[in-house]
């Protein structure tokens, strides 16, 4: 696996295009969630939509990146056995995960928040990807300021 792969899932899109350009200049292939890929495309940055790996988002966009394929690509160990299993199943290895979370604290601070609005701002897929990346010793970026 010569080319490195980065998974970008950004709620806050500020600076994500420049970050992706930097990764590409370092030899990374950039993968992303649909919204991130669409934003990058508008800025002229080519990225691969993970929907091609996991299918289109479902349940009102609640399930986007939660999948065996994404988790395995992040959690696989850098050993021949795991790499062979990824290859066998056509799963992409991810070297870097860049996720910023939905603004849950901001939503909770809004006096007009509702149970449903809080539920919608509770990030599951991003949290799962970040925890998997941390467990696997991958590069993890969670704050937009760290993309600069």
Over which residues does each language-model region extend?
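N-terminal glycine-/serine-/threonine-rich phosphate-binding loop
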Residues: 1-50
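Glycine-rich nucleotide/cofactor/substrate-binding loop typically near the N-terminus or early
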Residues: 35-104
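Short, basic, glycine/proline-bearing loop/turn elements
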Residues: 2-6, 68-73, 114
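Short, surface-exposed linear patches
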Residues: 27-32, 52-54, 69-71, 118-122
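Electropositive phosphate-/nucleotide-binding environments in soluble metabolic enzymes
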Residues: 10-17, 30, 34, 68, ...
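Internal alpha/beta core interface subdomains
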Residues: 4, 17, 22-25, 91-148
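General beta-strand structural signal in soluble alpha/beta enzymes
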Residues: 8-10, 29-34, 48-52, 76, ...
């Amino acid at each position: 696996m010569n080319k490195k792969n980065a998974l970008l899932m950004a709620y806050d899109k500020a600076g994500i295009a420049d970050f992706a350009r930097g990764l590409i200049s370092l030899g990374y292939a950039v993968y992303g969630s649909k919204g991130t890929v669409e934003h990058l495309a508008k800025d002229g940055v080519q990225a691969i939509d993970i929907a091609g790996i996991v299918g289109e988002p479902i349940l009102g966009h609640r399930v986007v990146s939660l999948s065996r394929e994404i988790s395995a690509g992040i959690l696989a160990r850098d050993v021949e056995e795991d790499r062979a299993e990824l290859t066998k199943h056509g799963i992409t290895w991810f070297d870097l995960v860049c996720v910023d979370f939905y603004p849950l604290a901001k939503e909770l601070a809004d006096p007009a928040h509702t149970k449903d609005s809080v539920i919608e701002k509770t990030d599951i897929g991003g949290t799962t990807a970040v925890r998997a990346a941390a467990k696997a010793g991958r590069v993890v970026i969670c704050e937009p300021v760290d993309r600069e």
